[in-house]
């Protein structure tokens, strides 16, 4: 659950958690001043700012006057992160507030792959457990991503992979043993790892996160060293609506951009006949780059850019 629950009311924005309206002063420069409402629950301030920026998309920044907020530990922590008492939307959403643990960091060394003749940064170790958690006020659900576990996820994953809708695009139906072995292989790969997406801690989707340079897509475009890519499927029928797709697609892109601050672009390469997915990609910040052929499918390459995502798309 959210620590704030900011909603629209007849008199402006209201916090259900505090059971009072927010004292917001609206400026002429697409900014606002949020006056301190008093004693706050743990985690309230960041949740409130996140939801204010969504409830009032015209806002470019929210000021938290230091003289009012200087006794509030949550505000002081935030001031230290942004080096100001003015919280800009684009900078705020790039803080690692929604990472479940600090992102892994690589050594900084470079690696040469002689077989593929590519030279790229050494990648960090695969993360463990949950990697991202954020309350999405648009759908009033908690979105989270965690590393897939062959022990607890194999039966569910097998059911998803044998769904005709999924099998049509993934071409990977098979027994429980086959799917368990597949998940285990994904957990030992050097350039990719598997995630399970959850709404309110209920699994609904499967994603594979990879470094584009080392993936098959790297042969088909001019990659940058920290480009990230993803494969995806939604396994549970109840979570297939457009509003849910926008939630997890933006959330997953957000995670990739937070996990590695040097990542400027995220890419996908869905089959060209996956028309339903393409309808959702542009609103989430993805634009078509080109179409090309893999040995097993014709694909469309789509890409999201960090600057465009945080300035024009958002969460």
Model-derived segments and their meaning:
Residues 33-43, 230-245:
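A short, internal acetyl-CoA/4′-phosphopantetheine-binding micro-motif in the GNAT/acyltransferase core
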Residues 141-173:
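Short amphipathic alpha-helix that is part of the acyltransferase structural core
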Residues 1-11, 108-151:
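Conserved N-terminal entry element of GNAT/NAT acetyltransferase domains
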Residues 1-10, 174-194:
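Active-site rim helix/loop that mediates acceptor-substrate recognition in acyltransferases
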Residues 21-25, 196, 202-212:
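Conserved beta-strand in the GNAT
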Residues 64-72, 267-278, 292-296:
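Conserved beta-strand-loop-alpha-helix junction that forms the acyl-donor binding cleft
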Residues 42-52, 241-257, 279:
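Conserved acetyl-CoA-binding loop-helix of GNAT-fold acetyltransferases
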Residues 52-68, 258-270:
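Conserved GNAT acetyl-CoA-binding A-motif
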């Amino acid at each position: 659950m959210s620590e704030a629950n900011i909603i629209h009311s007849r008199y402006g924005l209201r916090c259900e958690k505090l059971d009072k309206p927010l004292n917001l002063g609206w400026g002429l420069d697409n900014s606002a001043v949020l006056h301190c409402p008093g004693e706050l629950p743990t985690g309230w301030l960041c949740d409130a700012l996140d939801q204010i920026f969504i409830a009032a998309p015209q806002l470019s920044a929210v000021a938290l006057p230091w003289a009012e907020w200087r006794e509030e530990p949550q505000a002081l922590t935030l001031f230290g992160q942004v080096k100001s008492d003015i919280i800009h939307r684009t900078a705020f959403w790039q803080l690692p507030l929604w990472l479940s643990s600090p992102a892994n960091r690589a050594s900084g060394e470079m690696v040469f792959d002689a077989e593929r003749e590519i030279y790229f940064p050494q990648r960090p170790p695969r993360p463990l457990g949950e990697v991202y958690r954020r309350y999405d006020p648009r759908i009033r659900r908690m979105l989270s991503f965690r590393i897939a576990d062959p022990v607890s996820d194999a039966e569910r994953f097998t059911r998803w992979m044998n769904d005709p809708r999924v099998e049509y695009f993934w071409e990977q139906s098979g027994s429980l043993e086959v799917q368990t072995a597949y998940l285990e292989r994904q957990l030992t790969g050097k350039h990719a790892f598997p995630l399970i997406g959850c709404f309110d801690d209920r699994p609904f989707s499967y994603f594979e996160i990879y470094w584009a340079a080392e993936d098959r897509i790297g042969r088909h475009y001019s990659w940058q060293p920290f480009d990230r890519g993803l494969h995806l499927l939604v396994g549970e029928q109840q979570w297939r609506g457009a509003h849910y797709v926008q939630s997890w697609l933006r959330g997953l892109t957000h995670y990739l951009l937070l996990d590695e601050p040097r990542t400027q672009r995220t890419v996908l390469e869905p089959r060209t006949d996956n028309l339903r997915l393409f309808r959702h990609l542009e609103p989430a910040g993805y634009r078509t780059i080109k179409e090309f052929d893999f040995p097993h499918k014709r694909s469309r390459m789509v890409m999201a850019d960090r600057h465009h995502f945080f300035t024009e798309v958002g969460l």
